[in-house]
Amino acid sequence: MSTAAPILLTPGPLTTSARTRQAMLVDWGSWDRDFNQLTASLCQQLLAIINGAGTHHCVPLQGSGTFAVEAAIGTLVPRDGKVLVLINGAYGQRLAKICKVLGRAYSTFETAEDEPTTAADVDRLLQADASITHVALIHCETSTGILNPLPDIARVVANHGKRLIIDAMSSFGALPIDASEVPFDALIAASGKCLEGVPGMGFVFANQASLAAAEGNSHSLAMDLHDQHSYMAKTGQWRFTPPTHVVAALHEALLQYNEEGGLPARHQRYASNCKTLLDGMAAIGLRSFLPADIQAPIIVTFHAPRDARYAFKDFYERVKAKGFILYPGKLTQVETFRVGCIGCVGPDGMSAAVNAIAEVLREMEVLDI
């Protein structure tokens, strides 16, 4: 087995740089001025990525990305609102479950796991149901890696006078989203994805006017984004104990993000990773689940080999022993596994991963791929 730390080819947590990990070796006082300045700098840098200064607030929140998604829906959707949830995978299903648990009225529109939702679909659905106030969708559905057509859907939602909530967990920082061109009430992301920080903090880019009007909407004290933002604006501090080391790591990760060249460079590296992965896997006979035109360069789903000697658990452990951690499939009808293209890794690392996978399949005597 490799004695080095494995490379995480997953959708998050990810392999991080030594500099990012080093940033967590310093302790911070949660109410100290230096930490408050760190938080403010972080939010300013995050807003700059979406060109959101002046129109949106960046509201950070402790916890996983799902915490932030739930906070956004609970804060920005009034209790008498109704959400149209667009689904083509497990994370869209989670959006619907959040609405159900929060007691928000909702309807769903579901397409196949390899079929993007179209703007025409959304236009038809909004024409048919005037009671819908908000539309929620996953930008890059992590269960497959499918990319939904966000700009087109956003225009349709805005034309109908409705509000858009975007789960951009697996796309923010790597795929372009400009708040001046894509109208939305909320865009949600997290520290441990394409920014290559560590998990433990989500953040919501909330439309300033919508957030100001959201007082009293939230079902929760801890997840009330209106209260979180108001308190931060007055004091510079988090309401409750912040994940200080996570914030410091993300701040350092953003320095490296900008040194690399920002979003264009991060996108280019991930796209190169994805191409290297797809070409290499095709050469050994492994088929990707999605066609190239709807495949985001974030995570790729592959059909599992048909050979009876293939078993994912054994395959996973053998690849791990060679230094790479993969991800199980999350489809309902087809046996698959997933390989991430993101994190502190480049095309050479992806080539090494493909070689490790090929070696393992030979060791397992898997022939029918």
From Swiss-Prot:
Organism superkingdom: Bacteria
Annotated function: Involved in phosphonate degradation.
SUPFAM superfamilies documented for this protein: PLP-dependent transferases
EC number in record: 2.6.1.37
Substrates-to-products reaction catalysed: (2-aminoethyl)phosphonate + pyruvate = phosphonoacetaldehyde + L-alanine
Cofactors required: pyridoxal 5'-phosphate
A Pfam family: Aminotran_5
Stated name of the protein: 2-aminoethylphosphonate--pyruvate transaminase
Presence of keyword Transferase: yes
Subunit structure: Homodimer.
InterPro entries in alphabetical order: Aminotrans_V_dom, NH2EtPonate_pyrv_transaminase, PyrdxlP-dep_Trfase, PyrdxlP-dep_Trfase_major, PyrdxlP-dep_Trfase_small, SP_NH2Trfase/AEP_transaminase
Family membership: Belongs to the class-V pyridoxal-phosphate-dependent aminotransferase family. PhnW subfamily.
Record keyword Transferase present: yes
N6-(pyridoxal phosphate)lysine carried by residues: 193
Entry keyword set: Aminotransferase, Pyridoxal phosphate, Pyruvate, Transferase
GO biological process: organic phosphonate catabolic process
Sample GO molecular function, one term: 2-aminoethylphosphonate-pyruvate transaminase activity
Class in the EC hierarchy, top level: transferase
